[in-house]
Every structure is written in C-alpha cells, then in structure tokens.
Amino acid sequence: MSSKTLYDKVWDLHRIADLPGGATQLFVGLHLIHEVTSPQAFAALEEKGLSVNCPDRTIATVDHIVPTTNHQRPFSDPLAEEMLHTLEKNCSNHHIKLFGIGSGNQGIVHVMAPESGLTQPGMTIACGDSHTSTHGAFGAIAFGIGTSQVRDVLATQSLAMKKLKVRRIWVDGQLTNGVFAKDLILHVIRHLGVKGGVGYAYEFAGPAIKKLSMEERMTICNMAIEGGARCGYVNPDQTTFDYLEGKPYIPTGQEWESALQWWKELASDQNAIFDDEVKFDACKISPTVTWGITPGQAIGIDELIPKVDSLETSDQQTAREAYLYMNLHPGSSIEGLGIDVCFIGSCTNGRLSDLQAAAKIVKNRHVAKGIKAFVVPGSEKVAKAAEAEGLDVLFQNAGFEWRKPGCSMCLAMNPDRLEGNQISASSSNRNFKGRQGSARGRTLLMSPAMVAAAAISGSVTDVRNLINQGP
C-alpha cells in the first residue's frame, strides 16, 4: 500500500533525472512570468541564441509596477513603461501569451492564474516571485524562483532542485466568527517562526482546513513562504474541483472526467509518512495583527505586545529592533493604535471573497476622518465581479478609493506608497522595514475585515465588535 504524501507523488511524476550532489532535475508544468524578474532572463537567452523551450507552458501578466489610479499608456513613470514594453516585446518575440492591461485577464500573477484555471492539481509551477506558493492551494507544488532560474525554466522547462522534507500542519476545529484564513496563517507563523519552515514543504490539513474555501486556502498557502517553507499545499478535494470546473483553461467533457479521476488520486495517502507534524486548534485563534517587522511578530487582538524576556533568546534582538522601529512599547495593547493608511488588496487578500468580507464591515459606515483608505482588486476579473455586486459603489460611498488591479502598496514598486512614518493597516503579506515605500513606514498585517474595521474606527480595532453591532 502506498504511503506517499502529495508532495512525494508530484515530485516523482515530474522528476527527469537525479543529479550529482543530491539535486533533481524537475520538469516544470507551468511557468508564470511578469515584468520585474523576466527581462534579465530573456536577455540571457538572447545572448546565447536560445529560444523559449515551451512557450505554450509559459503565461505572462503585468502586476508589480502597474499604477492603480490610471492604467492609461504610456505610464507616467518612464521606468514602469519601459518594463511593460520590454515584457510585451519579449512575449511577442517568443510567442508567449500575455494577459495585458485591458485584456479582461490582467491581474496579480497569483490571482490571475488560479481564477483562469491555469493552476491545477498535480502541477509543478514556477514563477519569479516569492509568493508562488499560493498555487499549492490546489494541490500543486509551486516554487518562487530567482531570475537565473527564470532563465533556466525558459530555456529548458525544468529546474535543478533538492527535495524538501514535509511537515503536516494539522488544524482542528473551525474558525470562529470574525476570524479568517489570514488570522490562521499569521497564528501559525507566529508559533513556528519565520525560519521554522526552512527546508520544508508545508501540508495544511485537518477539519479547519477542509472547511476553507479555495480563496481562503490560497491565503494560507500564499504566506507559507513567510514561515520559511519553500512551498505550502492543500490536498485537492471536492471544494477544489467545484472551483475549477468551468474555468477557461480547465478541460471539458471526457477530458474533465479523466482529469478529475487523476486529481482524486493525488491527495496524501492515509498512512503517508511525514517528517514532522504540528497541530493547532482553530477555535483558539482570535483576530491577529502583526506588531513588529516580521510576519512572525504577531499577536491576537486581545493580547499585549510581548515583553522581550518572554520571547525565545533567538527572537529577542529582532524584537528590540521592532520596538524601536515601530515606536511601540512591550506590554502595551495593539488595539487602539492609530492608523494613517488602510490598504485592502494584494496576492494574499485581493480576491472577491476578501472584498466581500471587508464590504460587510464597511456597509452603512464611513472611513474615519484623516484616514486614507483604498481597495485594489487583485485582477480585472475580480474588479468586474465586485463591480457587478456594487462593491465599488459601497466602498466609495464609505470613503474608500476604488483602484485598478495591481500589486499596489504591498511592495511599493509603483506610486502607491507610505510617506514618512505613517502606519498602515494592510491585508498584504510582508511588514519588513520600508516594505511599503517609506524607509520609516510602519506596516501592520491583518485580515481585510480587520483593515476595514481599522479604516472605520481610525485605529486597530477588534472586528468582532463591529460585527456584533451589525451594519
């Protein structure tokens, strides 16, 4: 009887050859590219007179540098315009499909690919972007890669990699009202650490994971990388199949039935052997907010910022840096901390269900005076669906700005930036020093609903209080 994990099965199916030194040459089923990490890779191909090996397995979009206030070309930033022009030229020269602005398909790469049905169970997926682990929500093994590896995949449709260990993260129970997938993954990273997953793939499993929607699973897998894991995944199940059926790139008819039969065999075997297992109880997780300069520096909304002597010795120096940079004091509450900017979007939380969750909090309320709040849909499809529901009008009536799709303030490679020492409540995935554009800007990570609550109150607020009040 087989005792393999999904990771083992997908790895074995894509193994081309074992290499000296313990690495494996692995076939890449889908290669996603964008404007930031691909130009140098294409230039390297041209220098060697090489062409793209499998253009039909390569899909491009533009996301990082896109201004979200206006998509009109040329962009006001000449560097951004040059980067997009270069991507367009490279895709044209190598016959690669580009989901460009106005195509109806453009969006953040990790939002665009799943909603189009490009991401499928059992695939190996690579992209020159840290949060490629998002696609693991479908039972794929997805890796973020560097520019030199982007070059290698373009040239050979393969990667040299060492096999990871697998840690199962088992989550019992069910998330309570006002607690979301973002809270769950911040809770996991808080307890396992930002380096706890180094050398591992994370398999997310258990009753609480089973109950999550596909978009919630994407949030979980998206941030596996923030816990040090190279990838994260969820076993495909009926929730997965229901989400995929009818998507543009999903097979139909007999091909769908055949795919479905194969996908059902991919899940980790009942007696699969894991290298490690950690258990959590979803019922004990509360709305969670980061207070420091790593995603692991997080606490429940009802907790106090930890004192340095309560932390592991290895975490104490980073905590001291965080207190100083964030201008926060150990032993104080994060609830009530004033906010300057509220950002809802990103590849972590820029999907339709994220906007719907925030909209429920915003309905019949208004952004607090002096707060800059904006919503950035993760893709053109998300924007269209949200606008069909009237969410754009709801947010704008409440004092939010409704923007065009793009990565926006997640990483500030575009005009959306913090200024000075502003504090943002952000639904993105990283709170590093200077991450959102200002060298002194401060980022608090939280769920979209918590960001909405912060926008309404003007400070970090327990979203459950607003839920209990009703709209």
From Swiss-Prot:
GO biological process: L-leucine biosynthetic process
Cofactor: [4Fe-4S] cluster
KW Coiled coil (keyword) present: no
Source taxon at top rank: Bacteria
GO MF annotation, one: 4 iron, 4 sulfur cluster binding
Class in the EC hierarchy, top level: lyase
Cofactor detail note: Binds 1 [4Fe-4S] cluster per subunit.
Matching InterPro entries: 3-IsopropMal_deHydase_lsu (IPR004430), Acnase/IPM_dHydase_lsu_aba_1/3 (IPR015931), Acoase/IPM_deHydtase_lsu_aba (IPR001030), Aconitase_4Fe-4S_BS (IPR018136), Aconitase_4Fe-4S_dom (IPR036008), IPM_dehydratase_rel_enz (IPR050067), IPMI_cat (IPR033941)
Reactions listed under catalytic activity: (2R,3S)-3-isopropylmalate = (2S)-2-isopropylmalate
Signal sequence region: none
Subunit structure and binding partners: Heterodimer of LeuC and LeuD.
HAMAP family attached to this UniProt entry: LeuC_type1
PANTHER family (UniProt xref): 3-ISOPROPYLMALATE DEHYDRATASE (PTHR43822:SF9), HOMOACONITASE, MITOCHONDRIAL-RELATED (PTHR43822)
Protein name from the UniProt record: 3-isopropylmalate dehydratase large subunit
Source species: Prochlorococcus marinus (strain MIT 9211)
Organism lineage: Bacteria, Bacillati, Cyanobacteriota, Cyanophyceae, Synechococcales
